[in-house]
Swiss-Prot record:
InterPro entries: Mannan_Polymerase_Subunit (IPR052086), Nucleotide-diphossugar_trans (IPR029044). It holds the Pfam family Anp1. This is Mannan polymerase II complex anp1 subunit. One of its GO terms (biological process) is cell wall mannoprotein biosynthetic process. The gene is anp1. Residues 1-28, 387-430 are annotated as: Disordered. The lineage of its organism: Eukaryota, Fungi, Dikarya, Ascomycota, Taphrinomycotina. One of its GO terms (molecular function) is mannosyltransferase activity.
Amino acid sequence: MKANRDFGRDGGPFSITPNRFQPKSSGNPIFRQKTIRTVGIIALTLVLFLFFHRSFFSSFGEFPSFSSTANAPNSDVQEYDLRKVMNAKFTGDYSPKEKVLICAPLRNAAEHLNMFFGHMNNLTYPHELIDLAFLISDTDDNTLEVLKQHLDAIQNDEDESKHFNNVLIMLKDFGAIFGQEFSDRHGFAAQGPRRKLMARARNWLLSAAIQPYHSWVYWRDVDVETAPNTILEDLMRHDKDIIVPNVYRPLPDWLGNEQPYDLNSWAESETALQLADTLGEDDVIVEGYAEYATWRPHLAYLRDPNGDPSVEMPLDGIGGVSIMSKAKVHLEGCEFPAFSFEKHAETEGFGKMAKRMGFSVYGLPHYVIWHIYEPSDDDKRIMAEMERERKEREAAELEEAKKYQTAGFTQPDDQGAEEGPLAHADDHVD
């Protein structure tokens, strides 16, 4: 049949002749053996070269180093024992070399940086164990330039013990619409949105700066006027997950000399819990305002000037002027809520969240640091009124002096005789 012819094995268009594959001649066997031996030697040489020269790979970005030690030079693999971080505890001994991350959010802070770096320069905790991190946001002054000047001076100080381990500067705007005047920052209407925005800034700063080797995180406002040089050690010694000092501010004599500044450190009250139940989902309770009467015990109002500075008070909410936190608190996911968490945000929400997660939160009612004095609008009105009264009083005194001068000093009469109440003061009767 033609089918066999067309598709069979008898020479048709699809036939294969011969029917069995015949390999080409194998050639000279001696030549083939030499070739195999040469290729083998080249391959072995290449393997040995790569084995003894691992750095060959490191010159190419796509080839990672094979080193697994944290301290190996030029290593891309780093190893950290987080058990040390989780068990951070300061007992006065610096030998464990527990590193501290100091975080400072900045906004139009140029005028305060000289004071801030004066404090940083005098810290007694070893500077080689301290990292500094700054986030500059929504700023229209020369904060960045002034910051760099101070950092350049301190990091190039002849005394190397003044040098900090590492410094990080970040710039990120958040669209802040609130001014930096005292009343702008502390007005009731601004508190909820402002706290949420500040929480975002803190979280950006924290997440970008914290490292696996940090044992502690210390938050510090740059406008603190007075604080002990030993503040890091003082707060660490209490061995709390989160701890804050009391914060006051000085006042002019006519305002009473001093005043509690940070009312955001408090213990919860039943009244406040009931108030929270009446608020909307996004509402935020803020302290120190008549609109929210919480009747909470405030750390600031429990201060005794002669009290023991080591006395501790358990807290639920905390202020943000000065916070010492173990790094594990942040590493386990506790940050600053930029939303209403149990009707609180930012640092107060941070305290609430930490308590919910089982961390210890404390304050020191008799251990005080001092914030700068910034006059509020009410203070400015009082000062303006006092200035007006002072000028009126001076004008009245000047007018009275003129009247006294007119009445008290004598004037000569037409004949040269003195007239007036002093004219005959020296007369005497024989």
